[in-house]
Structures are given as structure tokens and as C-alpha cells.
Design a protein with these regions (language model features):
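Short, low-complexity N-terminal intrinsically disordered segments enriched in polar/charged residues
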Residues: 1-51, 184-192
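Low-complexity, intrinsically disordered terminal/linker segments enriched in charged
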Residues: 2-15, 129-132, 137, 155-192
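Soluble or luminal CAZymes and related metallo-dependent hydrolases
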Residues: 27, 31, 72, 137
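A solvent-exposed, acidic/Ser-Thr-rich amphipathic alpha-helical stretch
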Residues: 33, 45-118
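Residues embedded in well-ordered beta-strands within globular domains across many folds
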Residues: 57, 95, 153, 158-159
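Catalytic cores of transferase enzymes with a strong primary signal for eukaryotic protein kinases
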Residues: 83, 90-94, 121, 141-146, ...
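Exposed beta-sheet edge and beta->alpha loop/turn motif
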Residues: 107-150, 163-177
């Protein structure tokens, strides 16, 4: 795909994203598919601040539970752009239920594909140029979306990432791992 096609695709996604009203479950499903693609495929990490808030509770397989989704998400997202700049999010399914008064609940299944860039910084040095294919691991994500202080926010998120496949695939390619785990430790939700 050439530059013009990439820009046209991005513009079409942005057009939907910035004009969506979240009035039906179908719009919610489409909005969060577009949202995910804009962040991961078009490297728009700043969009994290559109739907995550200080009250977001995130439950991540292998890490635990923390509060403060927008900052944690940005810290985890930015370094991955260098490691695999051509990552694609392949949506297998996304489904939403709910309404504009009570809020929405959606679930999605994705798999990723791309290349670990030889120019990308990693814990072990530069990436090795290896590829990861669609369907090599799946990400399951479930979110609750409600109004917080007058705007739509993800208030609770549950993520299962196929961690073993990711660990094998990304051995020595996540320079931010120690830092991000220390960051999460400070955000852990206290048990009541």
C-alpha cells in the first residue's frame, strides 16, 4: 500500500472516529475498532487520553490490577512503536451491548501481525527483523464504557494477551518491561 492509500485509510478512520456519537451498540463496536487501529497501526498514542481516565481500572493478565489507565496505557504503548512499527491489529470479532443511558459493555478479539524492526531499540539491542504472523497469538479485551464527568470513558478493562506466545516472540525486545512493571506496582488497586 502506497503513501496515498495509507493516508486515505487513516483519514477515513479519523472521520468516523471524530464524528461518532456512541448512540448505539453498533457505533460503540465500530468506534473502538477504529480507536484501536488508530493507536496501534497509525501510532496515535495520544488518543489514549480520549477514552481512558484516572478512574479506569485495568486487569491485565500476568501484571495484575491497577487504577489510572491513561498514563499506564501511554507508558506501555509508546515504546512498542519503535520495536514493531508496521504492526497490524487484525480484528476477529467485536461486539457491544448497552445503551447511551446505562453505558456500554464490549468485547473484542484481535491478533497482531508485523515485523520486529532491525532499527527498533530493544533490551537486547536492535530488533532482529523477524515477523509475527496473524493468528500466532490472540488478545481478548473486555471493557465497560460509562460517562465520567460528562464524557465517555472506559471505566473497567480486562485484557488477556496470549502471554506465553508474546513472551517467546518478544524475548529481549521490550526495553520498557522492567520500568512498566515498576510503574504498575505503584498503581495497584488496594484490596478492600
Amino acid at each position: 500500500m502506497g503513501r496515498k492509500e495509507v493516508l486515505a485509510e487513516r483519514r477515513a478512520l479519523e472521520n468516523f472516529y471524530y464524528n461518532c456519537k456512541l448512540e448505539t451498540p453498533q457505533e460503540v463496536a465500530k468506534q473502538f475498532e477504529v480507536y484501536t487501529r488508530l493507536i496501534w497501526e497509525f501510532h496515535q498514542a495520544g488518543l489514549c487520553y480520549d477514552y481512558y481516565c484516572d478512574q479506569t481500572v485495568t486487569h491485565l493478565e500476568g501484571v495484575g490490577t491497577w487504577v489510572g489507565g491513561k498514563d499506564a496505557l501511554e507508558v506501555e504503548t509508546l515504546p512498542t512503536f519503535s520495536a514493531y512499527p508496521n504492526k497490524k491489529c487484525n480484528f476477529k470479532e467485536i461486539y457491544a451491548v448497552g445503551d447511551a443511558e446505562q453505558g456500554y459493555h464490549f468485547g473484542q478479539i484481535t491478533s497482531n501481525s508485523g515485523t520486529f524492526s532491525r532499527a527498533g531499540a530493544t533490551m537486547g539491542g536492535l530488533g532482529d527483523g523477524s515477523t509475527f504472523d496473524e493468528d500466532s497469538s490472540y488478545c481478548l479485551c473486555e471493557c465497560y464504557v460509562n460517562k465520567v464527568e460528562g464524557r465517555w470513558c472506559i471505566v473497567s478493562e480486562f485484557v488477556v494477551n496470549g502471554q506465553e506466545a508474546i513472551r517467546r516472540r518478544t524475548a529481549n525486545t521490550r526495553p520498557f518491561c522492567k520500568t512498566i512493571l515498576e510503574f504498575y506496582k505503584g498503581l495497584e488497586k488496594e484490596d478492600s
